[in-house]
From Swiss-Prot:
TPR repeats lie at residues 1096-1129, 1222-1255, 1257-1290. The lineage of its organism: Eukaryota, Metazoa, Ecdysozoa, Arthropoda, Hexapoda. Residues 58-67, 959-975 have a biased composition (Basic residues). Keywords: Cytoplasm, Phosphoprotein, Repeat, TPR repeat. Residues 1-97, 719-762, 952-998, 1407-1435 are annotated as: Disordered. This is Protein clueless. Disulfide bonds: none annotated.
Length: 1435
């Protein structure tokens, strides 16, 4: 199970194909784990991987000769255990948003001591990984009819892993029904290898064919079908079985590591037309290159179950299990019997049943062997399929953790497939034949995994892996169930009620629809509130899960948007269906505060969680006017299940309300906010602040707290009262000045020069504060405790702390909830309702006044610019800014010319979201028989101005059914899915129709482009308080530069539409752009929680800190270990694994190993394509990194192809006007220049220069580099005059920014001298020709030396932010000691404050809720350090 096995030594160790195991058979075996006994539960829940980090990966201590390659150095070894282990489908991806919760949780644990186990592992130096790494054993495996096979396994693996391995190897993949025997004793599938006494290195395990049962025969047939369609991308396009697409192999035409270096003169470097600068609307077809040839050879025409099934009684007694029907490529038809000994041809025909064996009879234990025997075409095709399958990269064959859906798909041939048909029946749950006891008790599984022990690292890995697997299965089942509910395949538990009020149970999961049932949300916004409540509830579940308090349980929760409906799927609390909710709830309120209950155990558990989540315990009056203490919002309900567990649910108000979007009598907002248009009355009253905002707000207050404490500490230690007074006079203005400086720094209109000027002032202020505290610290221990307490008290009062003598910032989530009567405490204390309200107001003001300007300022440097709406949303969320502030963000961006691209992305995101609100209403009132016509009509109205002619089929079926065709088109809602108040028809100039369903079912035909854009405009004003000022797609294009193809992509991904892969003519004047055949599918948009891998995260962040200090090798080792742990928890395929791979590739490159970098980055690209999507922004960035490493390895042509792909995807996503396009164009230009394609090179660099001037200004370093590249290219073309002008620009920028003596300025001056020389020479020759009058004679050749590949690579590194610089050992020691000094000073600040507060609070027993201070800024300056004298710096 070698995760960190050196690829050079792994020939015998790594066993072949690395079990991709994407078959349901293997899923079945995994699921069996869950059915095991309690005794083996911890082992069984974690499929196949026993406890931990697989293989002889490196130890943290005592291993000096660690491999430099990352934990995964061969494709086969890469996949978790040295053999790929199947990853089950797990939900979709708010992964980044969820990661924020994880980060915050970890930070909180650090700040507050955590809960023991989690705090302990933060110091990676203290973790001994010996427990996870074992030497492994070599085992021989003997298969019937095959050579002896030798594999290396970890002693911690389960026997089942060997099953997985054999089922994926080419020679044994067709075997499913076998046992493994050692010395004639059958091994238990769920036994760890180390528990088998007779097993030792060199032992031979024998594969023994077992008799089939009905279940095993079905599994075998399914496995054969999966092998035959292994290359078929249909499942990936249809979004099933956790398959997804990757096109890296298609673009590189094979493994990059197998390529030979290319000579520059042999490279075909002409870019496709759609990649050259100036293309406005990129084509759609190149998104899926070569999809026509992806399917592979056909082995059989038909393989299906026979209509003669099941075997009659007499044949059952002869051992018949089932009958199959096959048509071979030779057009021969066979009826096949499956019996306990294998498969044989029988004598049945389509009309006659004759189950006796055919003559001559041939019995085979494997169906593949039998089919190969009767059909030569099958034998050839199967071999070809197997060969192509084994040539694919291992990462292409593993199932992804979450289903990735494609927004564009080609026309797929629909083939006969009995197994697919069988899976589609609603009675099927997907795993009946695999699990004892049939349906799974999801709640029990989810809670049991959380109860697993977590004290040691192996235990935590086991627990997190179990949580991840069960959660993934639950998300898949919930998604499938939600689709079945909306499609009308599930019977409601209350079928007699109105369809909007119906609830469903399927597969032990409870489903409810996003409508206001029984006026529950009437006071809060009705259907609008009911629609957003599940999303807020999911946020609550996420943060409570991240805090992970032992004994406190949340429900498994998934929110699915499908066909215009929002469905919430939840696991079921044991016993809750047996009694009324009123009887179940022991904590909280079921009627928004009218009746309130409390419970001591819940108070204890929620108080623990509240420390991390900054929730203030508070008291409210119940219906009997008795005070009741709560440690959560009133809506949070506590129910003790029949299993004795304490569950909390309805966590939609976990965080305090956002008063900027509530019109409240008692709230007076600041003048600044009122001028900006606040408060805005939102359409529901559930608006909450984000956890990230509260963290930032508390951190901001903590910085002020330290500042003020520093001043008072200095005063406290002054020797004379007079000195104290004078110091106060000096210091307080200094503090005010510092605060003023901070405010100025957040001014978004500052120029870069102003920003640079401000920085030294900040530094001086910080240094002054550090010195003050260090001086005070020397005496603080002997200070009078009363005086110390006074210092703390003053600092607390100044920053508005909830407690008088402690830094304590916690929020009351109920403080503005209507109908709740609070118990008011003394004024100025934490119990004071006025003080609680003020704090929530301050946090909301902080969002607008500080966080939005900070967000804009952060993106002014364009260091990691958002590429699409999803990127933008993630960035907003990381700053704690809710998307409802998007209108305000757009206004801020609109004042910044250099933020044009982000302004456009934000406007497009707003249009997409507004359109989504309208679309959901539109879909709910559409007859299922008209869905494709209705969707295509909607897209025509949104994206085109051509003829709109919705054609409704008038066949008899439609007439008979009227408009009430589907189960859920009856869910008529006036809410517009959180969109419009009126049905679409009322806003199209038509009259209001009757409310009959038949009339409503045709509302969609009345929508026109004009009416739709009017609705979008109205929605943008109502929801975001921003006037779109567009009445058509054309006006949006001309005003904002939005491309229709970008808008189509964004909208399809947002609402779950799959369109046909073809070129769309948006300007067609004769027929609509979209027809009903262009809508291929609709898919669910799934929101869920991503479980975390806490230890891996801690290794990763520690590794990053080491890298920032310049300790690349140490950082590399830590991040390698993080990847090791991630492989254990998540398996081979996961977004976080991809982040680790990208970092390891970059580190390998910086450490000088370009080949290693290429191997790792190739895996990172494939992983990103598969888990994020083929056109995801992350994938685009991975492609650009891979192109650099390809060039460094001599694959010049391949590097260009990768850049062309990246550029195409980037333009398809956000258009050409983007800083990232400038970077890619600079790279392309430089490589084309190296290949002598000067004219092409010039086109790309001119475009890059134009963008760099626009976004960085005419004095930026990016612009200087672009001018220099242009000069190089023009000089090679002989245009010395232009080259000279451009190099002069470069020189002037370097001179003004870096000074005359800087190396770059001197290089540019030298370049100018050479260009001037060349220009003079050329002019002389021209003059000679003219003076001689020989105009007809040929010009003498100009000697131009093309650049060397080394100089091109150096320039590529510069463009991509990588510098290699020479530093002497003395310099390294000097800089490092300076950094250590700074870090110590920073630590001293913390120590001073802690000791001061401890003194003030009785021997340090108080809880100081302070955010974690970090040394990132100090560490960043250490980036140039390393252990050698040549160093790489990555910026």
């Amino acid at each position: 199970m070698a995760l960190e096995m050196d690829s050079k030594n792994s020939n015998s160790a790594v066993t072949g194909d690395a079990a991709a195991a994407t078959t349901k058979t293997n899923k079945a075996k995994e699921n069996n784990n869950l059915a095991g006994s309690k005794k083996n539960q911890s082992q069984n829940l974690v499929n196949g991987n026993g406890t931990a980090a697989d293989g002889p990966a490196t130890k943290k201590k005592g291993k000096k000769n660690r491999n430099k390659s990352p934990p995964v150095s061969t494709d086969e070894a890469a996949l978790s255990n040295g053999h790929v282990e199947e990853k089950k489908p797990e939900g979709d991806g708010d992964a980044d948003a969820d990661a924020n919760a994880n980060v915050v949780a970890v930070k909180d644990e650090k700040a507050e001591g955590g809960d023991g186990a989690d705090a302990a592992e933060l110091d990676t130096e203290d973790i001994d990984l010996d427990a996870l790494h074992d030497a492994g054993i070599h085992v021989n495996i003997s298969c019937p009819g095959s050579e002896l096979l030798t594999v290396q396994l970890s002693s911690m693996e389960l026997v089942q892993e060997i099953h997985q391995l054999l089922m994926d190897r080419e020679e044994s993949c067709h075997r499913t029904c076998f046992s493994l025997q050692l010395d004639n004793v059958t091994l238990d599938n769920f036994a760890e290898l180390k528990t088998i006494e007779q097993l030792e290195s060199g032992s031979t395990i024998k594969v023994v064919e077992e008799p089939y049962t009905m279940r095993e025969a079905r599994i075998h047939v399914r496995h054969v079908r999966d092998l035959l369609k292994n290359l078929d991308p249909a499942d990936a396009y249809n979004g099933i079985e956790c398959t997804s697409l990757t096109y890296l192999n298609t673009i590189t035409q094979g493994d990059l590591l197998d390529k030979k270096k290319t000579r520059p003169d042999s490279v075909d470097c002409t870019p496709p037309d759609y990649v050259t600068p100036g293309v406005f609307e990129p084509p759609l077809l190149p998104l899926h290159p070569n999809f026509k040839n992806a399917k592979g050879p056909q082995a059989l025409k038909v393989l299906t179950t026979s209509a003669w099934n099941p075997p009659p009684g007499p044949r059952k007694l002869h051992g018949d299990l089932m009958y199959l029907y096959v048509i071979t490529m030779e057009e021969k038809r066979y009826h096949i019997s499956a019996c306990s000994r294998g498969f044989f041809i029988n004598q049945s025909t389509d009309d006659t049943f004759n189950p006796k064996p055919d003559n001559p009879s041939y019995l085979s234990h494997s169906l593949i062997d039998l089919l190969s025997h009767i059909s030569p075409s099958f034998r050839r095709a199967f071999q070809a399929i197997q060969k192509r399958r084994t040539l694919r990269h291992a990462f292409e064959r593993v199932a992804t953790p979450y289903q990735v859906y494609q927004w564009a798909a080609p026309n797929l041939e629909h083939t006969v497939d009995a197994i697919r048909a069988e899976d589609a029946f609603s009675s099927k749950l997907g795993y009946e034949e695999h699990i004892p006891g049939q349906t799974r008790d999801w709640n029990e599984e989810l809670q049991t995994t959380r109860e697993l022990p977590r004290k040691t690292l192996p235990e935590r890995l086991l627990r997190e892996r179990a949580i991840f697997k069960v959660h993934g299965d639950f998300v898949t089942a919930a998604t499938r169930g939600a689709m079945a509910v909306i499609d009308g395949n599930v019977l409601a538990i209350n079928p007699g009620e109105d369809s909007k009020m119906q609830m469903f149970i399927w597969n032990n999961i409870f489903f409810s629809l996003g409508f206001d049932v029984r006026d529950h949300y009437k006071e809060l916004g009705g259907d609008y509130a009911a629609y957003v409540a599940p999303r807020y509830d999911l946020h609550g579940v996420r943060v409570y899960n991240a805090v992970d308090v032992e004994g406190l349980y949340t429900l498994g929760t998934v929110v699915i948007d499908y066909r215009g409906y929002r469905v919430t799927a939840q696991s079921i609390i044991p016993g809750i269906l047996e009694r009324e909710q009123e009887q179940s709830v022991v904590y909280g309120s079921i009627d928004f505060g009218k009746t309130v209950l409390s419970h001591p155990k819940y108070l204890e558990l929620l108080r623990q969680a509240g420390k991390h989540l900054k929730i203030l315990p508070h008291s409210v009056y119940n219906e009997r006017d008795e005070p009741v203490e709560l440690c959560s919002s009133v809506e949070c309900k506590g129910i003790i299940g029949n299993d004795g567990r304490h569950y909390i649910l309805d966590l939609l108000r976990t965080f305090p309300p956002d008063v900027n979007f509530l019109k409240l009598q008692e709230v007076k907002l600041s003048t600044e906010l009122v001028e900006m248009g606040f408060p805005i009355e939102h359409r529901h009253k559930l608006c909450c602040l984000r956890q990230e905002l509260l963290e930032a707000f508390v951190e901001d207050r903590y910085v002020n707290f330290i500042r003020i404490a520093a001043v008072h500490l200095q005063q406290l230690n002054a020797k004379k009262p007079e000195e104290t007074q004078s110091e106060e006079k000096k210091q307080l203005p200094a503090i005010e000045e510092a605060e003023k400086e901070n405010k100025e720094n957040l001014n978004v209109n500052e120029t870069p020069n102003e920003k640079e000027k401000d920085t030294p002032v900040e530094t001086k202020n910080a240094e002054a504060m550090v010195n003050a505290i260090r001086e005070a610290q020397s005496n603080v221990a002997t200070s009078n405790e009363i005086q110390a307490a006074e210092v703390v008290k003053q600092a607390c009062a100044a920053v508005g702390s909830m407690k008088e003598k402690e830094f304590d910032f916690r929020f009351n989530p109920d403080v503005f909830s209507p109908g709740i009567r609070h118990v008011d405490g003394e004024e100025g204390t934490s119990g004071s309702v006025a003080k609680q309200k003020l704090l929530v107001q301050d946090a909301a003001e902080f969002l607008v006044v500080k966080q939005i300007p900070a967000f804009v300022k952060e993106h002014l440097s364009h260091s990691s610019p958002p590429i699409d709406g999803q990127n933008l949303t993630e960035s907003l969320h990381s700053h704690g800014i809710n998307v409802r502030y998007l209108g305000k963000v757009i206004k801020a961006l609109g004042q910044m010319p250099r933020m044009d691209y982000l302004y456009r992305i934000a406007v497009m995101e707003l249009i997409v979201r507004a359109t989504k609100h309208i679309y959901y209403t539109y879909m709910q009132s559409t007859d299922p028989m008209h869905l494709s016509v209705a969707i295509s009509h909607f897209l025509n109205c949104l994206l085109t101005n051509g003829p709109i002619n919705p054609v409704v089929s008038n066949d008899e079926m439609h007439k008979k059914r009227g408009g009430n065709g589907g189960k859920h088109n009856k869910h008529k809602s006036s809410k517009g899915g959180k969109g419009q108040q009126q049905p679409a028809i009322n806003q199209n100039g038509g009259s209001t129709t009757s409310s009959s369903s038949s009339a409503n079912a045709y509302d969609w035909t009345l929508v026109t482009p004009r009416s739709l854009w009017q609705q979008i405009r109205k929605e943008s004003k109502a929801y975001w308080d921003w006037d779109l000022d567009c009445d058509s797609m054309d006006s949006a294009m001309s005003k904002f530069g939005i491309m229709r193809i970008c808008l189509l992509r964004a909208f399809c991904l947002k609402v779950g539409i799959q369109v046909l892969l073809r070129e769309y003519n948006f300007d067609s004047k004769h027929k609509p752009t979209f027809g009903d055949d262009d809508i291929v599918n609709v898919f669910p948009v799934v929101k869920h929680i991503s479980p975390r891998a806490s230890d891996a995260y801690n290794f990763y962040t520690t590794g990053q800190a080491k890298i920032q200090q310049g300790l690349f090798k140490e950082g590399y080792e830590l991040i390698s270990e993080a990847l090791n742990l991630l492989n254990n928890v998540f398996g081979a395929m996961h977004q976080e694994n991809g982040s680790c791979l990208r970092m390891l590739a970059r580190l390998s490159y910086l450490l000088g190993d370009a080949q290693d970098a290429l191997a790792i980055q190739q895996r990172a690209v494939i992983m990103s394509e598969r888990v994020n999507g083929i056109d995801n922004p992350s994938t685009i960035l991975e492609y650009t990194h891979l192109s650099l490493y390809s060039f460094a390895n001599g694959h010049v042509g391949m590097s260009l192809k990768l850049l062309y792909r990246a550029r195409y995807l980037l333009v398809l996503t956000c258009g050409e006007d983007h800083p990232e396009v400038a970077l890619i164009d600079s790279n392309i230009s430089l490589i084309l220049h190296a290949l002598g394609e000067y004219e092409l090179s010039l086109r790309f660099i001119e475009h890059a220069l134009k963008l760099n001037l626009k976004y960085f200004g005419n004095k930026a370093m990016h612009v200087a580099v672009s001018y220099h590249l242009m000069a190089r290219t023009q000089s090679c073309m002989g245009d010395f005059r232009s080259a000279l002008n451009n190099e002069k620009e470069t020189y002037s920028i370097y001179k003004s920014q870096l000074g005359e003596k800087h190396e770059k300025t001197r290089d540019s001056a030298e370049c100018l001298r050479l260009l001037t020389q060349q220009a003079v020479l050329l002019q002389r020759k021209m003059n000679d020709i003219y003076s001689n009058g020989k105009l007809t004679s040929d010009l003498p050749p100009i000697h131009i030396t093309p650049p060397s590949m080394g100089s091109v690579l150096e320039m590529l590194n510069t463009i991509n932010g990588i510098l290699f610089v020479q530093i002497s050992q003395r310099d390294i020691v000097k800089v490092r000691s300076e950094i250590e000094k700074r870090m110590k000073a920073n630590t001293d600040v913390n120590e001073a404050i802690k000791s001061m507060v401890a003194a003030a609070n009785n021997n340090g027993e108080s809880e100081v809720l302070a955010p974690q201070d970090n040394n990132k800024e100090q560490a960043a300056t250490a980036q140039q350090l390393t252990n050698g004298d040549k160093v790489a710096v990555s910026s």
